[in-house]
Amino acid sequence: MAARLLFRRSSQILRSIQRNPQISSSFESPPCPIFHSLTTASPDPSRLSSLTFLRSLSIARRGPTRPKKIDIGAKARQMQNRRLWTYALTFSCIAGFVVIVLNQFQDQLVFYLTPSDAMEKFAENPTKNKFRLGGLVLEGSVAQPAASQEMEFVITDLITDILVRYKGSLPDLFREGHSVVVEGFIKPYTDEVRKEVSTKPISKKARNLDCFFSATEVLAKHDEKYMPQEVAAAIEKNKKIIEAAATEQAAEVAAS
């Protein structure tokens, strides 16, 4: 402690002497040997070494500065949190993209349905009105209005009949009583369309519906292999239902 105070005092005196050299001449008594050794202008190596020694002694008493400890656990937790947030954001983006793609695909997806199934789905959700209808062309239902380019015919699954209007030429293999697949939209009857339908020889079932099918494409073949399996199975099921009902009715008539 004494050495530090001595060093500070000597430094102050040295600075004051360097600023005003005339101060040294005002002292009547000769300066202290230590001060004389510090204030001399001669660059004596021994005196410089003593000054360096005092300065190093002052620094040594302060003690070495210890470096701050690095918390490895905190850094590891921070990196782990960053990874978790990165994974979460990446997964959210991927999930959102998949949902958007599936919704778009669902909107563009078109199912093969019978007229009965199509009318049931349209009643549940009128906004989803695009279908592929499969069934049989009802005999005697094909007609072309004189003042229109639209062809009209009725598709049936033996339970439900629906009027189809198609603008364009029908395929060469299109025949009454044969299978057909049409793609288009279910639309409600307008007053004009209903007035036209009332004067045409279409089935009573098709006339009693509140909507018709506006076809954008018609596909036809003579064999039943062209018909989708689900539609063919539904028609076969309806045949059995009709046959069973006819047999039951005949039995009731015979019993009476």
Swiss-Prot record:
Transit sequence range: 1-57
Q: Where are the transmembrane segments?
A: 84-106
Principal location class? mitochondrion
As recorded in Swiss-Prot or TrEMBL, the protein's gene is named CCME
Q: Which InterPro entries match?
A: CcmE, CcmE-like_sf, NA-bd_OB-fold
Which keywords label this protein?
A: Cytochrome c-type biogenesis, Heme, Iron, Membrane, Metal-binding, Mitochondrion, Mitochondrion inner membrane, Transit peptide, Transmembrane, Transmembrane helix
What is the protein name given in its UniProt record?
A: Cytochrome c-type biogenesis protein CcmE homolog, mitochondrial
- The residues the entry assigns to the signal sequence are none
